[in-house]
A protein has these predicted regions:
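Eukaryote-biased recognition of intrinsically disordered, low-complexity regulatory segments
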Residues: 4-27
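Short strand-turn-strand beta-turns centered on an Asx-Gly dipeptide
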Residues: 12, 29, 74-76
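Short, flexible N-terminal segments of the mature chain
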Residues: 21-39
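Well-ordered beta-strand positions in beta-sheet-rich domains
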Residues: 22-28, 86-88, 175
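Ferredoxin-type iron-sulfur electron-transfer modules in oxidoreductases and energy-metabolism complexes
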Residues: 35-54, 102-252
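Short, structured protein-protein interaction patches enriched in aromatics and acidic/basic residues
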Residues: 57-69
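Glycine-rich phosphate/adenylate-binding loop and adjacent beta-alpha elements
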Residues: 74-97, 101-104
């Protein structure tokens, strides 16, 4: 049976990337514990509007753990203390206790400038994909589905890599602000398949160069990214990306 909880919510307010920003505080009363975290934020916005205050801004879309837009730093943890493999929108208030102080912040990264409050611009990930996260194909008739033989193991591993939703939790958790888990997942999903091999060297070099250009840091293997990834991406992908990158550089 659901019960109601009351708590103090500290949420980040910032008018843009150059604004200093600050925390505002709001007392949330009698919130059902079967309410999702984003539904609770909806209630916050309604209460702020009714009080004549500026509403709180955060990003969201599908609310089904698919799109990766609900990127919030909750009590010092990307996506909050959810079940392993879950996003902010899959976090429920039963995870919190009556009287708690809950802190909500945006992703903190030079590569993710704040648009407003807790909404950040994750367009840097799109630019990394545009640098090489694709295969070049001729237009025309598609190949027969069974024309290229791929082992079940390779197909499964490539699909696991492809489940990355580009939410940015890996960057937010990393002390260096590295996007290596994201980049390595996108490189791996193609490197594991024969369609991705012809451009593998070019892809690894181009995507890492773009990642560095956009202000993301380097990986130092602390595995913080792996611990918070909502799709359970493995740092084995980072090892694969390093192999792809070193091989490409040696071949130059």
């Amino acid at each position: 049976m659901a019960k109601n909880i009351s708590f103090t919510l500290k949420y980040w307010k910032q008018n843009g990337p150059k604004d200093k920003g600050h925390f505002d505080t709001h007392e949330m009363k009698n919130i059902p514990d079967d309410t999702s975290f984003l539904e609770m934020l909806d209630i916050l916005i309604e209460e702020l509007i009714e009080a004549g205050e500026e509403p709180f801004v955060f990003d969201h879309d599908c609310r089904e753990g698919i799109c990766g837009m609900c990127s919030l730093y909750i009590n010092g943890v990307p996506h909050g203390k959810t079940e392993r493999g879950a996003t902010t929108c899959q976090l429920y208030m039963r995870r919190f206790n009556d009287g708690d102080v809950i802190t909500v912040e945006p992703w903190r990264s030079a590569g993710f400038p704040v648009i407003k409050d807790c909404m950040v611009d994750r367009g840097a990930f799109d630019k990394i994909i545009q640098a090489g996260g694709y295969t070049s194909v001729r237009t025309g008739q598609a190949q027969d589905a069974n024309a290229i033989l791929i082992s079940k193991e390779a197909a499964d591993e490539a699909m696991d890599c492809a489940t990355c939703i580009g939410c940015g939790a890996c960057v937010a958790a990393c002390k260096n602000g590295s996007a290596m888990l994201f980049v390595s997942s996108k490189v791996s999903q193609l490197a594991l398949l024969p369609q991705g091999r012809p451009e593998a060297a070019k892809r690894a070099k181009a995507m890492i160069a773009k990642m560095d250009e956009l202000g993301f840091g380097n990986c130092t293997n602390t595995r913080a990214c792996e611990a918070v990834c909502p799709k359970n991406e493995s740092i084995a992908n980072i090892a694969r990306l390093n192999r792809e990158f070193i091989s490409a550089k040696l071949a130059d």
